[in-house]
């Protein structure tokens, strides 16, 4: 993928250049997140910041600009998760919030809700490493559920419910809250009832996590 970083220097049409770079760097993020390969993810962040943002003006192409900000947020989120890095996770939050400056619920409700869910994930990961952003994560997830309803988009709804379950499960252990542990298990049950196996396999060892939350609940029950 070294050619992706060099492509901006080629004398080609700006739209072709942008499409080429964007396609390459999205593959780079997918590969980096899958292995995981933090080096690949950092290269992707560099391309987003140094190559794509300069040719994706918010004033001229606001939707393209917001898309780059969103994808930048995803790459930073993967790095933050792999390295327990509050710095990258905070930068991911900033990138998602910038994307939401352009992507409005009224005009692009599904995209808006998806970015809210991604913002919630960044806040949740910050909370897990001591960032104290649990309420911000919950607010973002609640916003996503305003659009991603079970009736209209069950898979998206279940993915948000899964994220809420992960948030509340860890939060309940930190603050020793029985009601929160029970709410976490309810959310995880909602998710597992709807999501296909391949979706669940990409999140974490969910069965083990559910057992951990059940143990927390049982301990709090006394």
Region locations from a protein language model:
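Eukaryotic tandem repeat interaction scaffolds
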Residues: 94-101, 105-155, 159, 164
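Defense-system signaling and execution modules centered on TIR/cGAS-STING-like, death/scaffold domains
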Residues: 1-35, 42-55, 186-189, 203-222
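Flexible helix-coil transition and linker loops at the boundaries of alpha-helical arrays
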Residues: 1-17, 34-35, 50-65, 100-112, ...
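Hydrophobic/aromatic packing residues within the alpha-helices of TPR/SEL1-like helical repeat arrays
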Residues: 1-2, 41, 48-52, 89, ...
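Short coil/turn connectors between adjacent alpha-helices in alpha-solenoid helical repeat scaffolds
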Residues: 28-43, 77-91, 124-136, 170-183, ...
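Conserved alpha-helical positions within TPR/SEL1-like repeat arrays
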Residues: 16-33, 63-81, 110-125, 156-166, ...
